[in-house]
Amino acid sequence: MKLSKHGVSFDEAATVFGDPLATTSADPDHSFDEERFLTFGVSRRGRLLAIAHVDRDDTIRIISARIATPAERTIYEEG
């Protein structure tokens, strides 16, 4: 994944999963063929990101990454 249209690279997005305060929840609105998840966490660059992903064969597959919205920031902060 190159730098996405949201200005977040795959490499930066992957660092969110190392955030001990990251929050992950199911994303039923986008789970059609497989269960999708949405994770909010701080990247190594210090940016709060929203990561859409699936867990496939014990591997996290990132679908998209973007800067978190103010509402998503609240979810993260309330943990």
Predicted feature residues:
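Ribonuclease/tRNase effector modules and their secretory precursors
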Residues: 1-79
